[in-house]
C-alpha cells in the first residue's frame, strides 16, 4: 500500500510515555550540556536534598520533553512551576523541588516522544493533523492499514509475537468509539511483505539506519542516572518509507508474560509498549492523563485489560472523523476550567467543592491547583485501579472551581475567546460566536454541580488537570469547528434546542455526558 510522504519533522524516538490530539514532534535533542549560566544549584534543588548530577538529569529530562523552553534561560520561579507540572505527569507529589522521588520516577523507562509542545511567541500556523499526523488514504471516517513484522526478536516465539500484535491492533479498532459520537472505523490487516505494509515492525540494535540509534540494554548513563529508550515510532506524516513504522531495541530482554516483569526484573513488557506505539503510528501524541494509554510512561498491564481513555478515543475521533461536540466539551473542561483554576482561588462567580478523599492529595502552590495520586504509577495494577475508582466514586465531592460567564465576570468571556482564537485557530468573529456555547456549557455545568441530587464522579475532577496533548490541540481543524458553529446557528434559526440555547445544557445533558466521560 502506498504511503503518504509530505515533508515533516521526524518523530522523536520513543521510550514511551501517553487525551486528545495529535501533532508530530522533532527528534529528541541531545542532553543539554552544563554551563555557568544555568540556575544556581540551590535554586534548582529547592531543598530536595539530591546531588548535582541528579538535578542536572531531571533538568535535562524536562528540557528534552518540553517542560522547559531552555534550562539556561529559566528563572527559579519558571523552573519550579515547570517542575511541578513534570512531577504531576510523573505521579509524585508536586513539591517544586528536585527530590529523590522525582529523580526515581524520571529514571523509569518511557517513550522518547515530546510531552509538551511549547507555544509560539506569535501566531503562526502550525503543522496540521492532515499533513503530519493522519494517514492520507483514510477514506471518510474509516482507515485501513496493513502491518508487517520484518525482523523478529529471539526473546519471544514468532507465532506468539504475531498474536500479540494482532491483539494490540484489535484493541484500537474495537475501543476507539464513544457512544452517540461519529464512528471511526479502524481496520488492520497483516501484509504479505514489508513493501506492502503501511506499518513495518522490527527489532534492531544500536545504529539501525534511521538516525535514532538505540542505547542498548538498560539504557545509557546521563549524569549518574540511566535513560532507557525501548522503542521509537514514526508518525504518519514522516518521510516514507519510515512513516508509521515501529522499532524496538533488541538489546533489551522482551517478555509477553506480565508475571515475569516488574519489580526486580529487567525484562520489558512488549504488549503494553506496542499498544502505546500503535497510538503514535495512528498519529496520536502524548497525554498527561495517567489513565490514558498514550501517557508517556510504561505500565505493565496485560493487553486484554487495557481500556482506552476518553483522551485516546477523542484523539482518534478528531483525527479521522473530524470535529466532535463531545470532544470539544472535553477540551473546554481541560482548557477553560483548568486555566481558571490555575489563576483564580476565590473569584466572584465561581462555585467550588471540597475533597474528602483519603487516597489522593491536593496541593496548592503558586496559584496552581494540583491533584495527585499518593502511589506511583509503577506500583498501580489494573485491579488496584478499578477498586480505587469505585471507592473514589463513593467518597468524592470534588475540589475544583467552575468559572462562570456573567455580566460582572467579563474576564472569563475574554479568556474563552482568547483560548478559542489561539487554540482552535478561529477568527475573532467565530470565537465570539462559539463563546456563547462555551458560556452556556459552563453555566449548565455550574448548575448541575450545585444540584442537591448531584453525585459527581472522580473523573470530573481528574479531567480538570487531565489535559491530553492529543485532545488539547485543535490546529488544522478550525474549519470543522466552524461547521459545528453553523449547525448550532441553524438549530437556533429553526427554533430547535441546541448549544446556543442556555437550556440545552441541563441535567439530562450532563448525566449523559459524564456517563460516557467517566468510563
UniProtKB/Swiss-Prot annotation:
Keyword check for Transmembrane: no
Entry's localization field: Secreted, Extracellular space, Extracellular matrix
Activity control: Inhibited by human TIMP1 and TIMP2 and the broad MMP inhibitors BB94 (Batimastat) and CT543.
Listed CDD domains: ZnMc_MMP
Tissue expression as described in the entry: Expressed in spermatheca and spermathecal-uterine valve, weakly in vulva and anal muscles and in two cells in the head (probably RMEV and RMED motor neurons).
Gene Ontology annotations of biological process type: collagen catabolic process; defense response to Gram-negative bacterium; determination of adult lifespan; ecdysis, collagen and cuticulin-based cuticle; extracellular matrix organization; heat acclimation; larval development; negative regulation of protein import into nucleus
Stored SMART domains: ZnMc (SM00235)
Stretches for region Disordered: 29-50, 391-410
Binding sites annotated in the UniProt record for Zn(2+) 1: 208, 210, 232, 247
Active site: 277
Domain remark in the UniProt entry: The conserved cysteine present in the cysteine-switch motif binds the catalytic zinc ion, thus inhibiting the enzyme. The dissociation of the cysteine from the zinc ion upon the activation-peptide release activates the enzyme.
Protein name: Matrix metalloproteinase-B
Amino acid at each position: 500500500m502506498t504511503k503518504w510522504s509530505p515533508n515533516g519533522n521526524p518523530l522523536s524516538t520513543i521510550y514511551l510515555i501517553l487525551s486528545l490530539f495529535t501533532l508530530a514532534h522533532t527528534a529528541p535533542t541531545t542532553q543539554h550540556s552544563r554551563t555557568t549560566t544555568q540556575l544556581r544549584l540551590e535554586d534548582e534543588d529547592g531543598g530536595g536534598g539530591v546531588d548535582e548530577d541528579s538535578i542536572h538529569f531531571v533538568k535535562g529530562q524536562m528540557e528534552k520533553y518540553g517542560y522547559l523552553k531552555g534550562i539556561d534561560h529559566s528563572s527559579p520561579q519558571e523552573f519550579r512551576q515547570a517542575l511541578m507540572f513534570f512531577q504531576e505527569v510523573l505521579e509524585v507529589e508536586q513539591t517544586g523541588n528536585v527530590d529523590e522521588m522525582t529523580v526515581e520516577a524520571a529514571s523509569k523507562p518511557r517513550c522518547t516522544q515530546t510531552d509538551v509542545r511549547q507555544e509560539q511567541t506569535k501566531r503562526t500556523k502550525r503543522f496540521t493533523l492532515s499533513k503530519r499526523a493522519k494517514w492520507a488514504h483514510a477514506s471518510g471516517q474509516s482507515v485501513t492499514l496493513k502491518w508487517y513484522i520484518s525482523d523478529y526478536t529471539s526473546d519471544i516465539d514468532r507465532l506468539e509475537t504475531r498474536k500479540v500484535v494482532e491483539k494490540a491492533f484489535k484493541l484500537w479498532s474495537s475501543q476507539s468509539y464513544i457512544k452517540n459520537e461519529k464512528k471511526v472505523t479502524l481496520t488492520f490487516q497483516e501484509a504479505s511483505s514489508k513493501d506492502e505494509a503501511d506499518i513495518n515492525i522490527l527489532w534492531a540494535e544500536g545504529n539501525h539506519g534511521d538516525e535514532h540509534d538505540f542505547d542498548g540494554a538498560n539504557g545509557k548513563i546521563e549524569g549518574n542516572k540511566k535513560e532507557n529508550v525501548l522503542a521509537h515510532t514514526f508518525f504518519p506524516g514522516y518521510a516514507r518509507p519510515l512513516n508509521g513504522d515501529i522499532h524496538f531495541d533488541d538489546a533489551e530482554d522482551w517478555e509477553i508474560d506480565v508475571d515475569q516483569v516488574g519489580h526486580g526484573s529487567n525484562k520489558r513488557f512488549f504488549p503494553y509498549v506496542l499498544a502505546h506505539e500503535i497510538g503514535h503510528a495512528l498519529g496520536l501524541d502524548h497525554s498527561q492523563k495517567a489513565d490514558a494509554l498514550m501517557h508517556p510512561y510504561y505500565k505493565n498491564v496485560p493487553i486484554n485489560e487495557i481500556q482506552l481513555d476518553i483522551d485516546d478515543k477523542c484523539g482518534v475521533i478528531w483525527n479521522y472523523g473530524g470535529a466532535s461536540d463531545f470532544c470539544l466539551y472535553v477540551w473546554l473542561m481541560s482548557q477553560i476550567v483548568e486555566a481558571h483554576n490555575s489563576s483564580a482561588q476565590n473569584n466572584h462567580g465561581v462555585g467550588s467543592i471540597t475533597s474528602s478523599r483519603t487516597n489522593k492529595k491536593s496541593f496548592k502552590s503558586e496559584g496552581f491547583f494540583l491533584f495527585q495520586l499518593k502511589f506511583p504509577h509503577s506500583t498501580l495494577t489494573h485491579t488496584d485501579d478499578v477498586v480505587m475508582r469505585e471507592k473514589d466514586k463513593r467518597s468524592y465531592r470534588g475540589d475544583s472551581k467552575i468559572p462562570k460567564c456573567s455580566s460582572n465576570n467579563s474576564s472569563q468571556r475574554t479568556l474563552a475567546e482568547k483560548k478559542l482564537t489561539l487554540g482552535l485557530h478561529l477568527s475573532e468573529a467565530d470565537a465570539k460566536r462559539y463563546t456563547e456555547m462555551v458560556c452556556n456549557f459552563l453555566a449548565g455545568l455550574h448548575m448541575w454541580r450545585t444540584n442537591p441530587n448531584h453525585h459527581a464522579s472522580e473523573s470530573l475532577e481528574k479531567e480538570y488537570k487531565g489535559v491530553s496533548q492529543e485532545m488539547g490541540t485543535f490546529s488544522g481543524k478550525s474549519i470543522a469547528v466552524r461547521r459545528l458553529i453553523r449547525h448550532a446557528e441553524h438549530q437556533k434559526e429553526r427554533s430547535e434546542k441546541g448549544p446556543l440555547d442556555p437550556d440545552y445544557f441541563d441535567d439530562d445533558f450532563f448525566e449523559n455526558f459524564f456517563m460516557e466521560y467517566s468510563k
